[in-house]
Amino acid sequence: MSKPIKQIHLAAHFPGVNNTTVWSDPAAGSHIEFSSFAQFAQTAERGKFDFLFLAEGLRLREQKGEIYDLDVVGRPDTFTVLAALAAVTERLGLTGTINSTFNEPYDVARQFASLDHLSGGRAAWNVVTSWDAFTGENFRCGGFLAEDQRYERAKTFLQTAQELFDSWRGDEIVADKANGVFVSDPDAGAFVHKDAHFDIHGRFNVPRSPQGRPVIFQAGDSEEGRDFAAAAADAIFSRHSTLDAGQAFYADVKGRLARYGRHRDELLILPAATFVIGDTDAEAADIAHQVQLAQVSPQTAIKFLEQLWNRDLSDHDPDGPLPSVEPVVGDNTISRGRASVRMFRDSIAIANDWRAKAEAENLSTRELIAEVMGRQSFVGSPQTVATTINDLVQADASDGFILVPHITPGGLDPFVDHVVPLLQERGVFRAEYEGTTLRDHLGLAPLPARSNHDLGRRSADADAATGVAS
């Protein structure tokens, strides 16, 4: 029996505040003005993409005590941008990254339920945790949460928010003008939740939204992150976009679903990838080389080098070999607020690996940094890129890709104009949206509302928590 042909899922990531974005390119626009977000989202919708994805950083990055300003600095609030985009798009899903460490479930649930209403059922939440006290200082929290507790809090945070989403069935609002009755159930929105992190009870004030809950994304790659995704997420944002790494990650995460009573098609694996398209493969390779040089300037190469070596290397030649001195090991780092620092736990071992690679391939410091810090990219003619993406999806290396252009807001256009039609011709990508909600686009089953029995029991628990007799 032949294997069914999979449909490809595509999404667009508005580039974040990192060196993927070539903000100095003459074609690059603002990362602050709404017109850039609107143009980017409308291009993704024109291409029939599943959703737009926004990352989020809660503190400006620093290096050697100064703002890291080689990349884009600053970004408008995620919810504000997504709510505005809901008004200028009709079908495109709207995915926002919201932190579970420095927020509260009630606030986040209200915001996502509201976004789901305003967008007609297109909201999604990428649940992330924060690992450093540096970010926590913005919230007067410092390092209040040990790193090994962050997923525990994230799990209970999500569970609490889901209980709030489910506190309405969806049929309570009757708006009976003749009899002056607005809701049919006096217990609508009642909730009570108590665990090691949250102790809340009351009434949730946003009625059930079109999807019931936002689609849940997760982006962690640790063992805890993979288990969290297998237990609770609808999709996972992955960095494993090559064939071997993608297949290994795909098999691992999909293989965990059964232990949580879930089927393999209930979680989508969506790696992020950049792309460079040319009329020919050779032209695309030339363009990609120029993009890589723009992404890893001499200054950027030195900054990345300093993050691993944890010492001032401002006098180092980026076109020369790697430093002969060893990295400085310790809790005090010269780079703060950058996720890549977490990858450098064993800095001496990584430095030795880098030296071996540089020597074997005759790479300068800058060339080495561009190789090891670059994101997986699809490079080639439209035909080559379309074939590569389809081959990876059909080989179960992914269920699709979250595409990250290096220029905004117009960097998505070449893919939409030249690659999407080829995928549509091959019958592996939609020609039109078939549904209206993000769950529809992702092929996820609708979420059933909680029964009257479940809601009544929760209302009684809430009354007991507040001392109200039932």
Annotate each predicted stretch with a short phrase.
Residues S2-G16, D148-Q211, D244-Q247, A251, ...:
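An alpha-helical appendage that flanks or caps ligand/catalytic pockets
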Residues S2-I5, E45-R46, L82-E90, D116-R122, ...:
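Acidic (Asp/Glu)-rich catalytic clusters
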Residues S2-V88, Q211-P214, T436, H453-R458, ...:
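N-terminal beta1-alpha1-beta2 module of alpha/beta enzyme domains
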Residues I8-A12, L52-L54, L92-G96, G121-V127, ...:
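Hydrophobic faces of well-ordered beta-strands that scaffold small-molecule active sites
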Residues L10, A44, K48, L85, ...:
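Conserved, mostly hydrophobic/aromatic
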Residues T21-S35, T97-Y106, G142-F144, D148, ...:
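Active-site mouth loops of central-metabolism enzymes
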Residues I32-G57, F228-S238, I389-G400:
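Catalytic domains of carbohydrate-active enzymes, especially glycoside hydrolases
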Residues V88-T89, G93-C141, L145, R153-F157:
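Hydrophobic or amphipathic alpha-helical targeting/insertion segments
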